[in-house]
Amino acid sequence: MPDAVGRELPRDGTVLAFDYGEKKIGVALGNFITREARALTILPNITVEGRFEAVAALIQEWNPVQLIVGMPVNPEGGEQPSMKLARRFGNQLNGRFGLPVEWVDERYTSRAASMAGARRGELDAEAARIILQQYFDQFPL
């Protein structure tokens, strides 16, 4: 099953998705077989070293074949300042862990997470879940 630019996507395996924020990073987990995402955790984003130590622990635990990063796009579809940070985070994930990274438009995911009933302390992980579910839904089997 090819992605938007014709690359072959994995057909099985675990996927981790990230909702990158300057203070917190929401994380979700899913797999290509069930194509269902679930909120996993929220990582503090205080230092670069701490951020990637926490991500490394998740990668070691879940052994993903693909990483997804939410791309913050403004309502009109244009770039906003946090987009550059999310793109850099995704590129660093690829460089540090050698795993393929895909970006998903994360417009309104925090609002959707709130409307879905996620509590305040769980919003970032729920937003990551929505990002990952959008990714799965974008490429039906």
From Swiss-Prot:
State which Enzyme Commission number(s) the record gives.
3.1.-.-
Q: Name one GO cellular component term.
A: cytosol
- Tell me the GO molecular function terms: nuclease activity
Q: Where does this polypeptide localize?
A: Cytoplasm
In terms of Pfam families, this protein maps to: RuvX
Q: Where are the transmembrane segments?
A: none
Question: Which InterPro entries does this UniProt record tie to the protein?
Answer: RNaseH-like_sf (IPR012337), YqgF (IPR005227), YqgF/RNaseH-like_dom (IPR006641), YqgF/RNaseH-like_dom_sf (IPR037027)
Family statement: Belongs to the YqgF nuclease family.
Please explain the role this protein plays, according to its UniProt record: Could be a nuclease involved in processing of the 5'-end of pre-16S rRNA.
What NCBIfam families does the database record attribute to this sequence?
RNAse_H_YqgF (TIGR00250)
Protein known as = Putative pre-16S rRNA nuclease
Q: Could you tell me which species this protein originates from?
A: Cupriavidus necator (strain ATCC 17699 / DSM 428 / KCTC 22496 / NCIMB 10442 / H16 / Stanier 337) (Ralstonia eutropha)
